[in-house]
Structure formats: structure tokens, C-alpha cells
Amino acid sequence: AFAFSDRRLKRNIKRVGTHVLGVGIYEFDMAGYRQRGVIAQELEAVRPDLVKRHDSGYLMVNYGAL
């Protein structure tokens, strides 16, 4: 399933690891919660098929396919 993962929506971003695809894994604040995941802009550079643009203009990641 796709979920919002655009860098512009995240605050207090801290890199905590590296995904097997070579992109960073981050902890960040988004939508009022501390979360963990990738940044869509980084993932789009290596796997554009896992990223789509929402009607709002923000990028979403298919976390189910990661």
C-alpha cells in the first residue's frame, strides 16, 4: 500500500540505517507521530516504480513492495 513519504512532510529527520536498496532509513516526525521509513525523493532516484505523486503534489511510497 502507498503511504505519504515526501521529505517536505517530515520534521526532525534522523538517519538510523540503510535499506538494502541503498537508500536511508530514517526516524522522523510526521502527522503528529514519530515514525520510521524512507524518503520518497531518495527512493525515486533508484526505484521510481515504488513512488507515485498524489494529487496534492506530495510523493507516496509503496511500502508493501519494499
What label would you give each PLM region?
Residues A1-L66:
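C-terminal intramolecular chaperone/autoprocessing and neck/assembly modules of extracellular spikes
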